[in-house]
Amino acid sequence: MQRLVATSVNTVTLQEVEKPSLKAGEILAQTLVTGVCGSDIHAVQGHHPFVPVPYNPGHEVVGVIRELAPDVKGFAVGDRVTVEPDLPCWDCKNCNSGQENLCENLKFFGCGYTQGGMADFWTLPATRFHKVPESFSDEAAAMIEPLSTPVHAVKLSFIGSKDLTGKTVAILGCGTIGLLTLYAAKYFNAKTIVMTDLLEKKRNLAKQLGADMVFDAASKTLPSDIRQAVGQSIDVVYDCVAIQQTVSQAISLADKAGTVMIVGVPAKEVTVPLPIIQDHQIRIQGSATYLPADYHDSINIISQPSFKAKEIVTAVFPKDQAQKAFDTAIAGEQIKVLIRFS
């Protein structure tokens, strides 16, 4: 079988490897499609804070079950599936309190793990699998994992409320995670949704998919422009870029008493105006991956007629063009790039 390996900075190659053997409690799946995530881009460029090259990429994976260990129940050969790629220890404080996404001994399939989803076959514990609804295309199914990340972030931002009813929110970045955050914010009843991006075509797509207002992220007067347009500060800002410029913009937009959610994966450290954060009671909240309930919400969102997977998945490459797929994703002109394995 073949597995894609990020062998060095900006280089991925298909390698011949042995098919993984099945262990107790595991499922062996064959890959259909895998998404190139923003974290894959950071990692292959040598910028990811926790995933050095070489590594085995691929965690936004959709596959078909080919084998099951005898003790696995609830699944069958032929089921189409996606996975929760985080692999908790199930024994630490956080795992025992329902926060297995924050496991103190966490491993992550496709991010520094011995296997990744950019391979013909792979194995994982059955506890990490979710069945894909028959009505979903492979492209729509490939959105379940990445959508679960903003779903988790949006739910963390409720702060005692049941949803976003009455809230004005801003989403910084109109890439995959930004657009999926748009869907999550709409699903949880945000009143007004403002989005920003450097690229006009991405801003136009955000508007097409339901953003109330869009703004050029390069504007030097962005925070004041948005404040003037919405008539108030922003209740919740979802930073899906997580660079110095967007973090600074987010804090300005949330001033005063707002919340800033860090949704994107930062490639490096940033600085924040701590006196303003303290004095103006601005809340900055990180958000790490997801929980099983977030997958259920994601499936519900994708099931809605308003969800347009074809508008988000803008490029699909066969596995023998994986280098081109990564180069295309790195260039930043596309939204979501997929690699098809079978």
Briefly describe each language-model feature range.
Residues 159-165, 204-283, 323:
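Glycine-rich cofactor phosphate-binding loops and adjacent beta1-alpha1 units
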Residues 248-252, 292-342:
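C-terminal hydrophobic helical "lid"/dimerization subdomain
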Residues 20-34, 47-93, 133-135:
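Glycine-rich beta-strand-centered segment in the early N-terminal region that forms part
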Residues 198-199, 266, 290:
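Residues in the short beta-alpha loop(s) of Rossmann-like NAD(P)-binding domains
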Residues 1, 166-167, 191, 258, ...:
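Nucleotide donor/acceptor-binding cores
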Residues 89-172:
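NAD(P)H dinucleotide-binding glycine-rich loop of Rossmann-like/cofactor-binding domains
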Residues 136-219:
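Mid-domain Rossmann-like dinucleotide-binding core that forms the NAD(H)/NADP(H) cofactor-binding site
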